Amino acid sequence: MTSYSIPKTQWAVQLTGPDELRLNTSKPIHRPGPYQILGQVEAVGLCFSDLKLLKQFSKHARKERIGSGIDPAILREIPSYVPDETPTVPGHETTVRIVAVGDKVKGVRVGARYLVETDYRWLPTTNSNASFGYNFEGGLQQYVLMDQRVITSPEGEVFLLPASEKLSASAVALVEPWACVEEAYAVHERTTLKDGGKMLVVADGSIDNKLFTAFLGRFGSPARITIVARESFSLDSIPVVRANSVDELPAAGFDDVIYFGSNPATAETLFGKIAANGLILFVQGGNR
């Protein structure tokens, strides 16, 4: 097994209070206990979340003391657990190389490279949850100590992601912010009709029952259809309720709205009838 020469002290940037940063050139490097993991920091990124911690310090929701989810006796064994007014080390976008592990650590290999996953959501604080770089010291230091009992979820997932040697350390550390960007902009809307939902059908002209039945068979069947149309319309398998006008229908009352037509005023009115996470479909039939 690969062995590393580990110094007794290190350089670290510590946050000691609101807007109070200190460069500590002799911060002790703690040797790992039985369940602990020591990583050498290869790269760390900083983001606006770190600025909020800088300004709020102990008032930040993730700097609070853990309230449940782990035995307090375990937390007392971890020198990198730094809640409340205890100085912390920021930096949650971190790439590490494991240089030492305790004899009871499983699944984490000395010499291996990892991206640190940040949020320990099974360990709640009063207003949020425990997190690497907040109430546990982060990566703005040369070495960081983690505890497997903290970073392992109730489902058994260890919050260290193996990182390829083909990527630069900074590229690995950027996974976390890019994942936030992707999550913020990813589309999660339904792409089919809501089975068992409420559907509104509005038609300026006629509807082909056969084609519409095939459409429902392919994309999902609502529990009930409300229809506003000049011509009669019925289905064998789904109750159809007729309404005289769109205006008399409740706001945000329908999971799926289908408009057979192209009248701008009608289309604008229909947007107000869509429920949260609902869909609207325009069938123009060649019109504009």
Locate predicted features.
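Residue-level "contact hotspot" at macromolecular interaction interfaces
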Residues: 31, 87, 107, 171-174, ...
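A short acidic, Gly/Pro-enriched loop at the edge of an enzyme's catalytic core
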Residues: 248-257
